[in-house]
Amino acid sequence: MSLVAIGINHKTATVDLREKVAFSPDKIHDAMKSLASRTKTGEAVIISTCNRTELYTNTGDEAEVIRWLEEYHQLSHEDVEPCLYKFEGQAVAQHLMRVSSGLDSLILGEPQILGQVKQSFVKAKEAGSVAITMDRLFQNTFSVAKKIRTETEIGAAAVSVAFAAVSMAKHIFSSLSTTKVLLVGAGETIELVARHLKDNGVDSMVVANRTLSRAEGMCEEFGATAITLEQIPDYLPQADIVISSTASPLPILGKGMVEKALKQRRHQPMLLVDIAVPRDIEAEVAELDDAFLYTVDDLQSIIEQNMASRREAAEQAEVIAEEQSHLFMEWVRSLESVDSIREYRTASMAIKDELVERAINKLAQGGDSEKLLLELANKLTNKLIHAPTQALTVASRQGDLNSIGQLRTALGLDKN
């Protein structure tokens, strides 16, 4: 058997097709059992995220895996096949290591994918679709992803606006855990900002939004306080950090409002990060002595620098993934040789047992022991040398000197 992986992702298929081949969390358990039942080894792991669906098996039959996917989702071969990428053998291991390390992600080096791959592996184990090869492949992959994170800077630099905003705050304040943060807006970007802040130990967050119910829903998750936009002047003086991202056509925080808040703060510095377009914070706020205003353009230049840094780190990571996939395949080959040795020994022992049993029966019937012993030795020799003799004969007829040399070495004929 050999490793096979097929998949589609954001590079090869539209959102529409990705949705059609995705596996919902409540169905993926049974899907993995179904796919595993179609393989000779009973091994299958399915990774399904918003950006990719990938099927990993140890079947050696790529076409069968594709047929299963099409049948499961009731899709035509013409719709699915052109969007699939396929890997076999070592390429499977290398691809999985690249995916788990964020090297194949929409955002280069993003860490979330590793958690998603781990969840898929756990579900596969629960479904009983993991045996020795898949277990070793995924366990090795997790170690490689950790090695890449440790030995390269692939995940060190911020490459999203939300992450960059929080990274900037970390550079300015020695510890975010003691800061008070005002978030303006309650959309996806601000939610991501809140998550990064929470991960960095921020406990005091206020979320201001035009619709209070939307802010309250978000605050429940992060233990924050929800307020309306009209209440901002009351909470602004307590804020060390203000991060704003709304869809407002007009500025929400003006120079006068911020100036008044700074006076109440006795001119303690305030970091303001405006990641909205159009701006949420008046540009004139930057003129105030104790206000440090950054816009989305400032963050974008940081992101571009960081992306260059990640691309450089990705080159190092690619080398690690390739090296480690080679090592994994050495283990696979050693496993195959162990199986071959076991099969060869079993077959040889079966021949020996059969011939010994015949000899014992003949002895019991009064046969000549010396004659039977010689007959046993001859028959055993002939049986054991039959396969290598045939292989040497075929190689000689074909003029295959390489195979002849390998057979001579294996049979110990070239020993001095």
Curated annotation (Swiss-Prot):
Gene Ontology BP term (one): protoporphyrinogen IX biosynthetic process from glutamate
EC top class named in words: oxidoreductase
Residues annotated to bind substrate: 49-52, 105, 110-112, 116
Gene Ontology terms for molecular function: glutamyl-tRNA reductase activity; NADP binding
Catalysed reactions, as listed in the record: (S)-4-amino-5-oxopentanoate + tRNA(Glu) + NADP(+) = L-glutamyl-tRNA(Glu) + NADPH + H(+)
Annotated site residue numbers, Important for activity: 95
EC number(s) per entry: 1.2.1.70
Residue positions binding NADP(+): 185-190
Keyword line: NADP, Oxidoreductase, Porphyrin biosynthesis
Pfam short name (any one): Shikimate_DH
Active site: 50 (nucleophile)
Pathway: Porphyrin-containing compound metabolism; protoporphyrin-IX biosynthesis; 5-aminolevulinate from L-glutamyl-tRNA(Glu): step 1/2
Other information: During catalysis, the active site Cys acts as a nucleophile attacking the alpha-carbonyl group of tRNA-bound glutamate with the formation of a thioester intermediate between enzyme and glutamate, and the concomitant release of tRNA(Glu). The thioester intermediate is finally reduced by direct hydride transfer from NADPH, to form the product GSA.
Domain notes: Possesses an unusual extended V-shaped dimeric structure with each monomer consisting of three distinct domains arranged along a curved 'spinal' alpha-helix. The N-terminal catalytic domain specifically recognizes the glutamate moiety of the substrate. The second domain is the NADPH-binding domain, and the third C-terminal domain is responsible for dimerization.
NCBIfam families: hemA
Quaternary structure and partners: Homodimer.
Family statement: Belongs to the glutamyl-tRNA reductase family.
Function: Catalyzes the NADPH-dependent reduction of glutamyl-tRNA(Glu) to glutamate 1-semialdehyde (GSA).
Name of the protein in its database record: Glutamyl-tRNA reductase
Organism: Shewanella sediminis (strain HAW-EB3)
